[in-house]
C-alpha cells in the first residue's frame, strides 16, 4: 500500500516517534498527506539526550505536535534482568504507554517506523507491535531503509543520513543486569567520542572494560586520538579495547 493511500484511509493517527530516520520520514509523509497526526516520544533511561533533541527539532520543523512521555523502564525487573527477549518486554511497555496517551487524545490508530528492511524474525520487538495492533506504514508500503534515506534526502530532512541507533541497553551483554549507572556511563562515553567526530559507533561493556566498535573509515581517527581516548574513558572504565571487527 502506498503511503498516500494509507493516510487517505487513516487520516487521523498517532505516531511513535524516536527521532530516527524511519519515524522521521513517516511523520513527514503523514504531514505531507494532510493527515491529522501527533508524535509521541517515550523518554526512558535507554535513550540518550540527543535522540530527544533530534525528535523535538524535527517535530518543530514539520510543525507537528509532539508529546514526551516519561517512563521509568528501570522499575521493570523483567526488562532490567536483560533476557534475550528484553526488546519485546521493553517495546511492550513503551507502546502500551503511547497507546494509552494516544487514546486519551482521541487516536485509535498507532503507527511506528518499522520498514521493509527490518526482519520480523530477528526483532522480538516487532512481536510486541503486532500484539498491540501497531501499524507500520513504511513496511506496508515496501519501503526499504535505503529508499527511506533517499526519500528523506529529497525531502530535505536532516535525518536522511542519521546512523541507525540502538538503545543504550544493547551495549550491556545479555543476562547482565541493567542499571542506571551502567547506562549513564555508556552515554557519557559515547557523547565524548561523538565530540571527536566519530559516527555510527558503539561503546560496549565487557565488565569494567569498554570495547569500541567503529566503522573502518574511523579507525585512523581512533588511533590518532588513542592516548586521549584511553585517558578520558579511563575515568570510568578499567580498560579500553578497539574491536577490529568493524561496523558496516
Where are these regions (language model features)?
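Short, conserved charged micro-motifs
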Residues: 218-225
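Charged helix-capping and loop-helix junction motifs
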Residues: 184, 226-227
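Short, aliphatic-rich beta-strand segments
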Residues: 38, 205-216
Amino acid at each position: 500500500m502506498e503511503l498516500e493511500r494509507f493516510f487517505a484511509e487513516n487520516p487521523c493517527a498517532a505516531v511513535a516517534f524516536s527521532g530516527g530516520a524511519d519515524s522521521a520520514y513517516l511523520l513527514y509523509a503523514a504531514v505531507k498527506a494532510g493527515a491529522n497526526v501527533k508524535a509521541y516520544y517515550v523518554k526512558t533511561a535507554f535513550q540518550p539526550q540527543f535522540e530527544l533533541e533530534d525528535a523535538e527539532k524535527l517535530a518543530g520543523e514539520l510543525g507537528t505536535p509532539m508529546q514526551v512521555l516519561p517512563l521509568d523502564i528501570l522499575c521493570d525487573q523483567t526488562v532490567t534482568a536483560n533476557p534475550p527477549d528484553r526488546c519485546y518486554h521493553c517495546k511492550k511497555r513503551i507502546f502500551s504507554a503511547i497507546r494509552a496517551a494516544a487514546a486519551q487524545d482521541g487516536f485509535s490508530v498507532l503507527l511506528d517506523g518499522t520498514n521493509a528492511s527490518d526482519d520480523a524474525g530477528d526483532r522480538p520487538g516487532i512481536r510486541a507491535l503486532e500484539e498491540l495492533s501497531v501499524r507500520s506504514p513504511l513496511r506496508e508500503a515496501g519501503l526499504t531503509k535505503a529508499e527511506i534515506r533517499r526519500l528523506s534526502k529529497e525531502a530535505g530532512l536532516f535525518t536522511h543520513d542519521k546512523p541507525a541507533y540502538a538503545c543504550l541497553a544493547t551495549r550491556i551483554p545479555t543476562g547482565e543486569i541493567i542499571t542506571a549507572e551502567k547506562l549513564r556511563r555508556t552515554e557519557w562515553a559515547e557523547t565524548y567520542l561523538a565530540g571527536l567526530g566519530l559516527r555510527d559507533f558503539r561503546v560496549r561493556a565487557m565488565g569494567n572494560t569498554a570495547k569500541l566498535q567503529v566503522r573502518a573509515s574511523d579507525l585512523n581517527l581512533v588511533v590518532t586520538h588513542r592516548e586521549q581516548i584511553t585517558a578520558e574513558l579511563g575515568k570510568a572504565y578499567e580498560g579500553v579495547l578497539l574491536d577490529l571487527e568493524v561496523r558496516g
